[in-house]
Amino acid sequence: MAIFSNQATLTYNGNSTSSNIVYGELLEVLTATKTAVEGTYLPGELVTYVVTLRNTGTTALTGLTLSDDLGGYPFGTGTLYPLTYEADSILVFANGIPQAAPAVTAGPPLGITGITVPAGGDTVIVYQARVNSFASPQDGSTIVNTVTVTGSGLAAPVTATETVTAEAAPALTITKSVSPSQVVDNQQITYTFLIQNTGNTPVVATDNAVITDTFDPILSNLIVTFEGTPWTQGVQYNYTPATGLFSTVPGQITVPAATYTQDPVTGQYSVTPGTATLTVTGTV
């Protein structure tokens, strides 16, 4: 709401006198809200935003422009944008009725022009943005995102802000290798399982991570280590020699969280995965 004031001056015969000051309030007819459907984000994933413009006036508001700062934040002497508009993702509804897509400038910042909000009604704008390498993946990090609506019929720009938080979760991959790759009967062979965590939280015992494998050919006389520490059958792992079925006991596999580094020049984040290694050696 904008408060205005003014005062009159009366002059006569070289004299001057001032009136009282009067005050008024310029009521805003347009309000805006912004909501992220997901609420959290992951690197490389899409965030869906819903912007609702509500017109409480008796006249339609036309030719409005919406600008989205795509989460821009200062870095060095410039600005970094952790979100990238996803091309052709925009949908517009006026009082629930689909509308033609408006003109879009991907930016950053994102610009959407030619928006109309009906009298006594609302216009909903839905679009997506992809999380890029300028967004921090660290646990607790946020992207604060603001839209600004301008245009004729508005006393002042109208803004709305939404915050999404980096999703706190591990993200695991596993790679298996064998050495040697060519063996003969009664020769030892070693399988190595490399587990990598690119997520921002560790895998702990209560996550109950389990590795299972069926060795073919079947192995005997197993020697199992995890991160260089010997494991005992029936305690940290189980093995059925008749079938070759191997499995770790739930909760024995733990993996540290990844670490993230922001380049001091480019501002881009890089990831160093947390790792854990399981080795299984046996006789063919």
Where do the PLM segments sit?
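Exported/extracytosolic protein signature
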Residues: 1-284
